Amino acid sequence: MESAVDRHVFYISDGTAITAEVLGHAVMSQFPVAISSVTLPFVENISRARAVKEQIDAIYQQTGIRPLVFYSIVIPEIRDIILQSEGFCQDIVQALVAPLQQELNLDPTPVAHRTHGLNPGNLIKYDARIAAIDYTLAHDDGISLRNLDQAQVILLGVSRCGKTPTSLYLAMQYGIRAANYPFIADDMDNLVLPASLKPLQHKMFGLTINPERLAAIREERRENSRYASLRQCRMEVTEVEALYRKNKIPCLNSTNYSVEEIATKIMDIMGLNRRMY
C-alpha cells in the first residue's frame, strides 16, 4: 500500500454544507490520507460558484494533484460550474438518490437548504431542541439542581473528563435534556451521591478517564498545580469509579473516544431515543 499523501478536500453545498462535510469526512476516514479541508456553504449564486471553481483550480495549479470535491448542490447552474473545475467531484447525495428513485418509482423534488432548514413541518422539533439546549446550559457543571427530574440523563464525573461537551452535543444533535454534575477535590474525603440526586439514580451515567490523560488536560488549564498533578488525578478517578461500582451507575471511560462516540454510546446504553434534526 502506498504511504499517506496530503490531499486537499472541498465540502461544497448551496445549503449549510453539513451533509457534504459529514458524509465526505466519513468517506475520507476510510483512507490513510492526510487531508487539508475547506468547507464552503451557501454557494448559491453564479459569482460565488465561479470563485469556488477558481479556488479549486488554484490548488490544482499549485500542487498538480486534483482536489477532492464532495458536493451537495441542487441548483443546476451552480453544479455545472463546480463540475467544470479541476477537482475530482462527487455528488454525495445523488449517489443515494438514484437507486432510491428506482426502488420507490418516484422522482425526487430537490429543494436547496432542505436538510437543515426550518419549515412548518419541523418547527416544533426545532423548538424542542432549543429548549433542550437551554436546559442543558442551565444545568451545566452543577450550576442548578432545580428541575433535575426533567433531565433525560445526568452525567457525572471529575472535572475535565468531558461532561460539558458531551452534554451539549446530546442537546444540540439529539434534543436531549442533559444535566451534568461534577465531583471536585473537596468531595473526595467522603464521596457519596448528593441527596438531591439519589432519587434520580436511574438517569445517571458516569464518565471516567485515564489519570494520565486527565492530568495532561488539567495541566493546560492550571499549570503545575495540585489540581493537575498525576497523583491528584489518580486519586479522584479511583474514588469516582468506586462510587459508580457501589451505586451500580453505568459508566464509560472517555479517554479514547470522541464526543460524538461518547454521546452515541450514552444514548445506546441509557436507551434514549435518537431524534435527528
From Swiss-Prot:
Species per Swiss-Prot/TrEMBL record: Klebsiella pneumoniae (strain 342)
EC numbers on record: 2.7.11.33, 2.7.4.28
Single GO MF descriptor: ADP binding
PANTHER family referenced in this protein's UniProt entry, alphabetically: PYRUVATE, PHOSPHATE DIKINASE REGULATORY PROTEIN 1, CHLOROPLASTIC
Annotated positions binding ADP: G157, V158, S159, R160, C161, G162, K163, T164
Catalytic activity: [pyruvate, water dikinase] + ADP = [pyruvate, water dikinase]-phosphate + AMP + H(+); [pyruvate, water dikinase]-phosphate + phosphate + H(+) = [pyruvate, water dikinase] + diphosphate
Purpose: Bifunctional serine/threonine kinase and phosphorylase involved in the regulation of the phosphoenolpyruvate synthase (PEPS) by catalyzing its phosphorylation/dephosphorylation.
Entries under InterPro entries matching the protein: Kinase-pyrophosphorylase, PSRP
This protein's name: Putative phosphoenolpyruvate synthase regulatory protein
Pfam annotation, one family: Kinase-PPPase
Alphabetical UniProt keywords: Kinase, Nucleotide-binding, Serine/threonine-protein kinase, Transferase
Family to which the UniProt record says this protein belongs: Belongs to the pyruvate, phosphate/water dikinase regulatory protein family. PSRP subfamily.
